[in-house]
Amino acid sequence: MIKPRTPPGVLELLPREQIAFQRMLDVIRRNYERFGFLPVETPVFELSDVLLTKSGGETERQVYFVQSTGTLANAAESGATRLPELALRFDLTVPLARYVAEYEHVLAFPFRRYQIQRVYRGERAQRGRFREFYQCDIDVIGKQTLSIRYDAEVLAVIHAVFSELGIGDFQVQLNNRKVLRGFLESQGVRDGELQLAVLREVDKLDKRGVLDVRDTLIGQGFGIPAAQVENILTFVATRSTSHADALARLDALIQDSGPEAHDMLRQGVAELREVLTLVNVLGVPEHAYRLNFSIARGLDYYTGTVYETALINHPQIGSICSGGRYENLANHYTQSKLPGVGISIGLTRLFWQLRDAGLIDGIAESSVQAMVVLMDEATLDDALDIARRLRIGGINTEVQMEAKKLSKQFQYASRAGIRFVVLAGDDERARGVVAVKDLTREQQFEIPREELASTLQVELEQAKVM
């Protein structure tokens, strides 16, 4: 016999954990829709030449290619060495770029989309790293231009999602790449490629530490003078403590730079100021975000606002949501300029980390809210009728289809995490009531049959409030 097992790099859950995962996914979807984002799904596989048009190196080495056995045999016979025609998507951004470019003539801009689907990467299997995982993305895409105001709205979406998820205190770290690049200009780092390389190093500060990054920037690969490196590291250590402090630090940055401040720096500061002002109007509490000049995001296509979100009491988990502003989403697929701003939540990794940290326990019981006991074979019709009435009343209900011992049926309900067990023996039927055992509160009570569904609904709603 073959030993049943899953391939490495996948997260497979038992039902109660899957329910918790699904509820988190539902919260994310609900909040995305609440802010007016529209659902999009793209195929799990794309044409290789389309998917990989702007990738290479590490990304291409992690791609899963798809090939039918017939095509594989033909390629072997002909000695062909080209890439297979199809490949599994490795993120949702490239498929979005293809999608918007393909349908730009029928889409309404600004195009607000959310996408919640699995993606695939051939990463080395190790603890906490997945080859198949859910990404939950939103993006606002403009045509030619896109107001900076959307950047503030995206931050409000982050706040709404994680407030409802209830997984702990969190904070959004906010920055603007133009501020970083403008400051680098003031320090004599003017070459565009060198600036991007410096930003990638800055993005590694939390993992590698200040000393390591300092040595790298001073070293032969970069050759930046030590004094300028110190200025850069001091600058990226800036953190705001409140909304007013964030605005004050932006003012101070322009004042300290004087009349020679680079235009890019001024533009980045102006954009951050507008985002901060609107975030306040949108009702995001000031403790939920702060200015952090070290946030760069390692991906080079970000050009303006950048976000990273972390749990305050669990910093070891790292970023739980990130994203930013980009100037041209689909330049490889269309001549139209399509600027945008968006974020992504890697839900699979986040769930795994929360479970590993013990933060998932107690989030979910069964999705079945009530179970109707089968007292004996003669009461099957009555049990099915009770279940039907409960379902009509909005209660997720299961019926025991075999008349096992009551203790066995109760044991099943307990192990399955079902809260209410409904019984109707001869006495209860004669009096027009049912007996209900609340396994959570360890209480038993009787309810008139016609009030059963509404009463259980009230109990379930009260449990949500508690």
Swiss-Prot record:
GO BP annotations, alphabetical order: histidyl-tRNA aminoacylation
GO CC entries: cytoplasm
Family: Belongs to the class-II aminoacyl-tRNA synthetase family.
Pfam family, one: tRNA-synt_His
Location(s) in or outside the cell: Cytoplasm
HAMAP family: His_tRNA_synth
Uppermost EC category: ligase
Enzyme Commission code: 6.1.1.21
Origin superkingdom: Bacteria
Keyword DNA-binding part of the UniProt annotation: no
InterPro entries tied to this protein: aa-tRNA-synth_II, aa-tRNA-synth_II/BPL/LPL, Anticodon-bd, Anticodon-bd_dom_sf, His-tRNA-ligase, HisRS-like_core, HisRS/HisZ, HisRS_anticodon
Alphabetically ordered keywords of this record: Aminoacyl-tRNA synthetase, ATP-binding, Cytoplasm, Ligase, Nucleotide-binding, Protein biosynthesis
The name this protein goes by in its record: Histidine--tRNA ligase
Reactions performed catalytically: tRNA(His) + L-histidine + ATP = L-histidyl-tRNA(His) + AMP + diphosphate + H(+)
Binding partners and assembly: Homodimer.
The species this protein was found in: Xylella fastidiosa (strain Temecula1 / ATCC 700964)
Gene Ontology molecular function: any one: histidine-tRNA ligase activity
Gene3D superfamilies linked to this entry: Anticodon-binding domain (3.40.50.800), Bira Bifunctional Protein, Domain 2 (3.30.930.10)
Lineage start: Bacteria, Pseudomonadati, Pseudomonadota, Gammaproteobacteria, Lysobacterales
